[in-house]
């Protein structure tokens, strides 16, 4: 048994190690050698006055959202930090050809690059992944991050707006005399002065379209963050984005236009229908609800008024005036000769001159045509012949019932009363017949007064119709011109063709 165990042990020791095992052992020995005297808190500069160059790149994975109310942009990104640490260099030939190592981020010096304009107090990255160290001493770190950065929103042309949001990265504790920043590098080693977007993995936002994505290195004149004096460098990544307005066109602007059309056609609704005021107030309340719903989407700022709010206020003013003017039209429609006397200028303008220009034409009253009698009655008494002659040759209906002529003086109008009250010898009628004719004259006067009353009332109703039609065309013109002026102004608000003109 002892001999067998000895032979087994010799066989195990004599078996060659797998290449992976030798590699792991070589990596362990290399890491142990590199970090034997390594201090992660010491800046990797050969001399005190040397600057450590750090390149900062940004890969955008997703533009999550832009909260206009809180002026906050949420993004999912990958930072791309690269610098040189001379203490982490080696000769691959001396270490089984190992040319790179994966080391935990806590083990090496980091340039403490943070997002300065964060909006939630989280300056750091989301996950401290390993750094990749090459044999030349180049260190590359690509941590992912979910950032909420502040973004000043320009609301003037909302929802036809574009925004310029920035992400400002800098070394928080080192100034430019210790750490030199520059924009990220592309695979060829050239500076990439823009945000990198991988087309295969990028998730497009449904509300915003990225127009430009440049980056720029700036140097602040003096320490603006407090502490010791010195210059600080910052790498700023710009996201110039344009809103896709389809959602607001369908859900806000189109309903507002339809409600405005309802308010316009209030003036086409006859006053007798009794729904003019109800329809106007309904449109006004609906616009108020739209304004309240939109208030949650717009930033609470007094610097500018969004164009969509301007349009809603313009529409609300029109609808408010439609309510007021509907009251005016109803007041005109229900006037009568007992309460109001129509001025001469009102009659001239709204009855005679203005209607043809508005497409209105008042129908002419039809005159009753009475056939002339073709037979004569035989006289039966002495006075019957005179009576027969009177009824056969009766005056025309215009004499018994004078047509309404509101421009003719009352004294000049023919009147049956003067015919009755005239000299008896001119008529030669008995007293009984005169009493009958007097009664007929009284009824004629009553019918004439009623006809005058109805005619004057119809005049007021026609004036109300003309005013209604005038308001209809006025509102159509104002609504069309106002809508075009407001929204055509937004068509000229386009993102710049170049990010830095």
Curated annotation (Swiss-Prot):
It is a multi-pass membrane protein. Residues 363-375 have a biased composition (Basic and acidic residues). The chain crosses the membrane at residues 245-269, 277-295, 311-332, 470-488. One of its GO terms (biological process) is muscle cell development. It is found in: Postsynaptic cell membrane; Cell membrane. Residues 24-244 are extracellular. Its main location: membrane. Disulfide bonds join 151-165. It catalyses: K(+)(in) = K(+)(out); Na(+)(in) = Na(+)(out). One of its GO terms (molecular function) is acetylcholine binding. GO terms for cellular component: acetylcholine-gated channel complex; neuromuscular junction; plasma membrane; postsynaptic specialization membrane. The modification Phosphotyrosine is found at residue 390. Residues 362-382 are annotated as: Disordered. Residues 333-469 are cytoplasmic. Pfam families: Neur_chan_LBD (PF02931), Neur_chan_memb (PF02932). It comes from the Eukaryota. Glycans are attached at residue 164. Residues 1-23 form the signal peptide. Keywords: Cell membrane, Disulfide bond, Glycoprotein, Ion channel, Ion transport, Ligand-gated ion channel, Membrane, Phosphoprotein, Postsynaptic cell membrane, Receptor, Signal, Synapse, Transmembrane, Transmembrane helix, Transport. Pentamer of two alpha chains, and one each of the beta, delta, and gamma (in immature muscle) or epsilon (in mature muscle) chains. The muscle heteropentamer composed of alpha-1, beta-1, delta, epsilon subunits interacts with the alpha-conotoxin ImII. Belongs to the ligand-gated ion channel (TC 1.A.9) family. Acetylcholine receptor (TC 1.A.9.1) subfamily. Beta-1/CHRNB1 sub-subfamily. After binding acetylcholine, the AChR responds by an extensive change in conformation that affects all subunits and leads to opening of an ion-conducting channel across the plasma membrane. This is Acetylcholine receptor subunit beta.
């Amino acid at each position: 048994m002892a001999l067998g165990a000895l032979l087994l042990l010799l066989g195990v020791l004599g078996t060659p190690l797998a290449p992976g095992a030798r590699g792991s052992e070589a990596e362990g020995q290399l890491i142990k050698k590199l970090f034997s005297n390594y201090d992660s808190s010491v800046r990797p500069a050969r001399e005190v006055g040397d600057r450590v160059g750090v390149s900062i790149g940004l890969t955008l994975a997703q533009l999550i959202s832009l909260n206009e109310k809180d002026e906050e942009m949420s993004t999912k990104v990958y930072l791309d930090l690269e610098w040189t640490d001379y203490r982490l260099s080696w000769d691959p030939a001396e270490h089984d050809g190992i040319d790179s190592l994966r080391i935990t981020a806590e083990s090496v010096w980091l340039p403490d690059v943070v997002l300065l304009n964060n909006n939630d107090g989280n300056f750091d990255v989301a996950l401290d992944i390993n750094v990749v160290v090459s044999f030349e001493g180049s260190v590359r770190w690509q941590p992912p991050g979910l950032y909420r950065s502040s973004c000043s929103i320009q609301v003037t042309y909302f929802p036809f707006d574009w925004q310029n949001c920035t992400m400002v990265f800098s070394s928080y504790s080192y100034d430019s005399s210790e750490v030199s920043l520059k924009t990220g590098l592309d695979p060829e080693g050239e500076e990439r002065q823009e945000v990198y977007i991988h087309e295969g993995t990028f998730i497009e936002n449904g509300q915003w379209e990225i127009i430009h994505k440049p980056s720029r290195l700036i140097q602040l004149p003096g320490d603006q963050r407090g502490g010791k004096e010195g210059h600080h460098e910052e790498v700023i990544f710009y996201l110039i984005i344009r809103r896709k307005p389809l959602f607001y066109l369908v859900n806000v602007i189109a309903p507002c236009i339809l409600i405005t059309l309802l308010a316009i056609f209030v003036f086409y609704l006859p006053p007798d229908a009794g729904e003019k005021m109800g329809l106007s107030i309904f449109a006004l309340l609906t616009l108020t609800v739209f304004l309240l719903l939109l208030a949650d989407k717009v930033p609470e700022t007094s610097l500018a008024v969004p164009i969509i709010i301007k349009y809603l206020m313009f529409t609300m003013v029109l609808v408010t005036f439609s309510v007021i003017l509907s009251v005016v039209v109803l007041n005109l429609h229900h006037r009568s000769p007992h309460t109001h006397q129509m001025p001469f200028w009102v009659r001239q303008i709204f009855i005679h001159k203005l209607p043809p220009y508005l497409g209105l034409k008042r129908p002419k009253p039809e005159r009753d045509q009475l056939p002339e009698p073709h037979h004569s009655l035989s006289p039966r008494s002495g006075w019957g012949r005179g009576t027969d002659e009177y009824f056969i040759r009766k005056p025309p209906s215009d004499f018994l019932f004078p047509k309404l002529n509101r421009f003719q003086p009352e004294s000049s109008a023919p009147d049956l009363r003067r015919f009755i009250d005239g000299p008896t010898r001119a008529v030669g009628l008995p007293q009984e017949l005169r009493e009958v004719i007097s009664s007929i004259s009284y009824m004629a006067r009553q019918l004439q007064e009623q006809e005058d009353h109805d005619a004057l009332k119809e005049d007021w109703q026609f004036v109300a119709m003309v005013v209604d039609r005038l308001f209809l065309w006025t509102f159509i013109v104002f609504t069309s011109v106002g809508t075009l002026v407001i929204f055509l102004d937004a068509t000229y608000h386009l993102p710049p063709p170049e990010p830095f003109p």
